[in-house]
Design a protein with these regions (language model features):
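Membrane-interface helix-loop junctions and terminal tails of multi-pass membrane proteins
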Residues: 1-283
Length: 283
């Protein structure tokens, strides 16, 4: 006799992963979509401010979906405030985030394919071997590429590290159950993303999210070829890995100095190291 499992149980089990998939899809659909509208109209129908506002709105929307939409934040949360559930769900959530970003980029391309072809007939990559006569490189619509003035990718890595650290610091504050002064977490994440974009967005396009860059980059490889990975000295490695370290640092700093709740590996380690007089023991 077959056992019937209610559909609601299926949904509840899949919900964390569906939330990450849908949330990240929306993030890229909105974010890369506004970049496409700005770039393909030579910033006539969108500008740097509207690009920042759209990305920030997409991040705030993910809060309502209940998703982190960022593997760096998801991993940092599992490391800094670990639970068995977080670690059990970590692989599935990360895969869902990358898949959502890939599909989101595909939908952006589906919308703007004709406009891309008209604006950049050669389908070129920033820093690639094919030069556009007009100086247009449409691959930058989908993934991030560093500004031409950078002497090395290490300089760009600094920006990505700081941006991801600030983002994780803010996300940790939002997730702090004892942060009574926080009345509107969605607005805080919106404001934080606007601030990061306005202060750090120009030089690296502020990926601060491995899925935001690698998912669309992987899709763009179908259209633009392997140069999306090799361009700019294999720059793709920077937004894929650096935000992870930045997020761990930002979340760790928040918990070390601000967090007063339970379940923080950083706070627990500091409490264990304190002497009876409140000073750090060196014994």
């Amino acid at each position: 006799m077959a056992v019937r499992i209610p559909a609601s149980l299926h949904r509840s089990g899949l919900r964390p992963y569906l939330a990450e998939f849908i949330g990240t899809l929306l993030l890229i659909l909105i974010g890369d979509g506004v970049v496409a509208q700005a770039v393909l109209t030579d910033f006539y129908y969108a500008n740097f401010l509207s690009v920042n506002l759209a990305w920030a709105s997409a991040v705030a929307l993910s809060c309502y979906v209940g998703a982190a939409v960022n593997p760096a934040i998801t991993l940092a949360s599992a490391i800094i405030r670990p639970t068995k559930q977080q670690w059990a769900q970590l692989p599935g959530k990360v895969v869902a985030q990358f898949l959502g970003a890939f599909v989101g980029a595909a939908l952006v391309y589906l919308q703007y394919r004709s406009a891309i072809k008209a604006w950049d007939p050669e389908f070129t990559v920033p820093g690639g071997s094919i030069l556009s006569p007009q100086g247009h490189h449409s691959a930058g619509i989908f993934a991030t590429y560093p500004a031409a003035h950078f002497g090395s990718n290490w300089e760009a890595a600094v920006t990505e590290f700081l941006g991801a650290s600030l983002l994780a610091f803010g996300a940790s504050a939002v997730a702090d159950p004892k942060n009574e002064g926080l009345k509107a977490p969605q607005f805080m994440m919106f404001a934080l993303m606007v601030a990061i974009g306005a202060s750090m967005g120009w030089q690296t396009d502020y990926a601060v999210n491995p899925a935001r860059d690698f998912g669309p980059r992987l899709f763009s490889a179908i259209v633009y070829g392997r140069e999306v990975f090799s361009a700019k000295g294999f720059y793709f490695v920077v937004p894929l890995f650096v935000p992870i370290f930045g997020a761990i640092a930002g979340a760790g700093i928040y918990d070390a100095f601000m967090f007063e709740g339970e379940g923080s590996a950083v706070a627990d380690a500091l409490d264990a190291a304190e002497g009876h007089d409140g000073r750090i023991s060196l014994d």
